[in-house]
Amino acid sequence: MPLPIVAIIGRPNVGKSTIVNRLAESKDAIVHDEPGITRDRTYRNAYWEDREFQVVDTGGLVFDDNTEFLPLIREQAMAALVEASVAIFVVDGQTGLTGGDEEIAQWLRQQTIPILLAVNKCESITEGLTQAAMFWELGLGEPYPISGIHGNGTGELLDDLITYLPTQGEITETNQTKIAIVGRPNVGKSSLLNSFIGEKRAIVSPISGTTRDAIDTVVERNGKTYRLIDTAGIRKKKNVEYGAEFFGINRAFKAIRRAEVVMFVIDALDGVTEQDQKLANRIIEDGRACVIVVNKWDAIEKDNYTIYTYEQEVRSRLYFVEWAEMIFVSALTGKRVEKIINLIDNAANEYQRRVTTSVINEVLEEAISWNSPPTNRQGRQGKIYYGTQVTSKPPTIALFVNDPKRFPENYRRYIQSQFRQHLGFTGTPIRLLWRGKKAREVEQNTVNRATRV
């Protein structure tokens, strides 16, 4: 059963994200002293008493300005109200009542859901009552003086809020595949997200840096549940100003760590850039499965050989993630977007796959028969005793050897390539752990192994 939703509405910079973090007891929403930080609507799980719900943080509402993002933000706020059971209208107790507050209040009075009025920045309990009193004239009922920073008054607000939430039975945990959508700014991540789920969930604009938060969307396909995380575009550090974009990029890196599969989006018009290569390395370092999505394929002039030539070029630039599957799509037209989910399923399955010790050692035996470990200058040869998979997500194989130093990097790559050739693991990195072990210890453990090389 889906959680009931609470929408947070208000002017820019009244402290909506601070309140979201307070209610959700987290710091997921970006908080920075700059208007317009939150542009998309972002979802956080929250609890009060015995109730669980989702808090939706929306962008700052401005009705008398149609500059670039503002109409899109209004559209997002309206979408949040449509799906919400109750809304919290946040105003600034220190600034006092403004014309912008009155415009929003007039708009909210036309909505069909309950509205609670939260007067934020009332850090002083005694002065807070006076600050809140001026907002009675908005005609939205009793104003609650609260402090998003310190938490003053939020208990009373939540006590009232949960009375408006629909009754709900026991919430069951669903198995979700967590997918981070990452890439450089303006490669079409939000457009892909919207095309994938069939609604305008994230703001889409030709200006780089539109998405600043990491945004979660839960969707179901063919009986499976997916959590999609649309992240801020990642660019070179020297091009990143300290502030909201800096926090957003760090949130994107955190999203990669949260995910199981990374949907790595590349702009077909730009090809693979140096920053794309660095981002791919980040995915490998964090040990995440990956699907390479080449977007804007509709904008490329093609002949019968274009897709083959282009894939070869991308592969040559991203040779270190040769294990990732690739798909060419257009978020604008929707072409092939529906096929991405099959690649994600394959990558997720391989990411958590386990292989028996006997099969691993059969691969090792075959590999060693074709290419035995090298011998060093002192005439000492490396010896692989046996291997076993110690964990998944990503698949990690421990190789017990006489001395790890006797296995140079080129031979380690050879062994890894043999595992890929025989075991697959398409879409996921493989980690090999080279562990030194004395021959006597190996003999003692032989009885516990299915096969010995």
Curated annotation (Swiss-Prot):
Underlying gene: der
Residue ranges occupied by any KH-like domain in the UniProt entry: 353-438
The name this protein goes by in its record: GTPase Der
Quaternary structure note: Associates with the 50S ribosomal subunit.
GO molecular function, one term: ATP hydrolysis activity
Binding site for GTP 2: 183-190, 230-234, 295-298
Gene Ontology BP terms: ribosome biogenesis
Chain's role: GTPase that plays an essential role in the late steps of ribosome biogenesis.
Domain EngA-type G per the UniProt entry, residue ranges: 4-169, 177-352
Provenance organism: Trichodesmium erythraeum (strain IMS101)
